[in-house]
């Protein structure tokens, strides 16, 4: 099981969704969670360092989740960070685009705590966390 001190960054322009994800993470024992409202805000926080996992929405103003993902993967300092996309984009082409851009996992909204836990555990297992 992953380190409970792992620092998460939850990126979503909808504050209620950020709060839902934060609360689900808390239920799973992860209390070290920060929030960002779009990709630009997220990058500013990520460049300060210290994060171990990103959970990001797709559709956001300024910089969407896919652009954020591509930017993270192109930056050698952040490229290994796991990124879980949590989005209403359920179309096959969106899921393929996220996978090709390097998403560690993909969850379609709405989702349950069990679904989030299952995806996180798969990513932790794959990365040996």
UniProtKB/Swiss-Prot annotation:
PTM info: Phosphorylated by CheA or acetylated by acetyl-CoA synthetase, depending on which acetate metabolism pathway is available. Dephosphorylated (inactivated) by CheZ.
Residues at which Mg(2+) binds: 12-13, 57, 59
Phenotypic consequence of residue 14 to A: Diminished rate of phosphorylation
A Pfam family matched in the record: Response_reg
Gene3D superfamilies per UniProt: 3.40.50.2300
GO biological process: archaeal or bacterial-type flagellum-dependent cell motility; chemotaxis; phosphorelay signal transduction system
Molecular function via GO: metal ion binding
Record annotation: effect of changing residue 13 to N: Abolishes function, reduced rate of phosphorylation and affinity for magnesium ion
Residue ranges of domain Response regulatory in the record: 7-124
Location in or out of the cell: Cytoplasm
Cofactor(s) named in the record: Mg(2+)
UniProt modified residues of type N6-acetyllysine: 92, 109
Record's cofactor remark: Binds 1 Mg(2+) ion per subunit.
Major localization listed first in the record, in broad terms: cytoplasm
4-aspartylphosphate sites (modified residues): 57
UniProt keywords, alphabetically: Acetylation, Chemotaxis, Cytoplasm, Flagellar rotation, Magnesium, Metal-binding, Phosphoprotein, Two-component regulatory system
GO cellular component: cytoplasm
NCBIfam families: PRK10610.1
Subunit structure: Interacts (phosphorylated CheY) with CheZ (via C-terminus).
Biological role: Involved in the transmission of sensory signals from the chemoreceptors to the flagellar motors. In its active (phosphorylated or acetylated) form, CheY exhibits enhanced binding to a switch component, FliM, at the flagellar motor which induces a change from counterclockwise to clockwise flagellar rotation. Shows autophosphatase activity which is enhanced by CheZ.
Entry protein name: Chemotaxis protein CheY
Species the sequence originates in: Salmonella typhimurium (strain LT2 / SGSC1412 / ATCC 700720)
